[in-house]
Swiss-Prot record:
Its main location: cytoplasm. The gene is cysS. Binds 1 zinc ion per subunit. This is Cysteine--tRNA ligase. One of its GO terms (biological process) is cysteinyl-tRNA aminoacylation. It comes from Treponema denticola (strain ATCC 35405 / DSM 14222 / CIP 103919 / JCM 8153 / KCTC 15104). It is found in: Cytoplasm. Monomer. SMART domains: DALR_2. InterPro entries: Cys-tRNA-ligase, Cys-tRNA-synt_Ia_DALR, Cys-tRNA/MSH_ligase, Rossmann-like_a/b/a_fold, tRNA-synt_1_cat_dom, tRNAsynth_Ia_anticodon-bd. Zn(2+) binds at C29, C222, H247, E251.
Amino acid sequence: MSLKLHNTLGNKKEEFIPIHEGKAGVYGCGPTVYDYAHIGNLRTYVFQDILVKTLRFLGYDVTHVMNITDVGHLTDDEDSGEDKMVKSAEERGKSVLEIAEFYTKAFFNDTERLNIERPGIVCKATEHINEMIELIKRIEANGHTYMAGGNLYYDISTFPKYGELANINLEDLKAGARIEIDKNKRNPHDFVLWFTKSKFENQALVWDSPWGRGYPGWHIECSAMSMKYLGEQIDIHKGGIDHIRVHHTNEIAQSEGATGKKWVNYWLHNEFLVMNKGKMSKSAGSFIILEDVINKGFSALDYRFLLLGGHYRSQLTFSWEAMETAKNGRKNLNNRVAKWLDGLSDSEIMEYAALTENLNLKSAKDMIKNEKARSCFDNFIAAMEDDLSTPKALSELQLLIKEKDIPQKDVLTVLAAMDSILGIKLIEESFNTLKDKGSIEIDESEILKLIEERASAKLDKNYKLADEIRDKLKGMGIILEDQAGKTTWKKL
């Protein structure tokens, strides 16, 4: 099987075929750092992390780029409202740069606790103004812009494909326009590439440009920075569904308006995290941050586990009851995994934990010898290759740890491979469970059943299976002694 992803552009599942064989260029919209990320925002970054981990595990050389918006994002995506950074700075009595630095650190503190791998390239908008200006010049040279009221606008009527991503056309946009009117715009859905002081007198960060001293519109930064680090055509662009209608639609128009080439091959979007009152929203004041979750007695990994239980393209309802279920589910999972660790030395356990960082599809297949273990592993990979189906993948994980006749080393190798993608620190957290309990309680009936199965295997001269059962019991902390045709057991 091969990796298939649901492409928003075309609204169908497609086989992933990279531009350059064996490589994957991935761009994701990062946070606007004017406040803490709420847990709905963080769902996007867990999804992006799962995507990147899956690509890497499948053997792709991934270049992962994410922006940090620290200038130019208004409270409404359609160029209206206040500047989010300026508003936050004024409310808190800080400078815009102080606000950006504080909330950028807070964001990465949250992602670290969620075991989200930091993208290889993190780029700030304020550090790429020259790239934005140069890209705007190309867009202007191709006849897609006009000046009005001191600002440079993108004229969407010059780009016939406008709205294709969101499956809307220009006539629908005109008929359904319900946004704040900007009298400078020829079309309500035209958007600003470069603001001057005509928009905000109090803008804290401004730069010289061919169109006057000012600052960039929000959309241009993603086009400019993705092209700098990934080239003019990229494999995958990811983000939340709230970006489809405006931000990502505008990114396509300006990128392809500059280059004349298709910009992104695969668009991936995750659904909202919702509460009983609707979607989580900072502007509406209805949001929860990760610190709130932790202060309620949950861990960040409990929240990650909750997210894995839902497909990224399905809405997921958040509640404290759901968090309690996720917490108990992860606890039970760790207890079961800990049973497979019992009997190993600390160094042996840490070797398996280290495998999580080092395995890929090929190396894992080479290491997994047992047929049942291989089957669980293959089914897990099939689930992830089917548009990142984490609910199905978790089901395969649960089936694996319930098996009783797979050698310990194969189970732990498969667990390490699975966790290379899931990122819930299975072996490390289960090791902590083992240390906290001193030893895992052993089900005596299970031991006796395995001893009987081993005896039957020996009678059938299936010595390989008999040895595997002995090894499994040893992994559970049980030593067998064969004397005078009778087998006894004791704890290590």
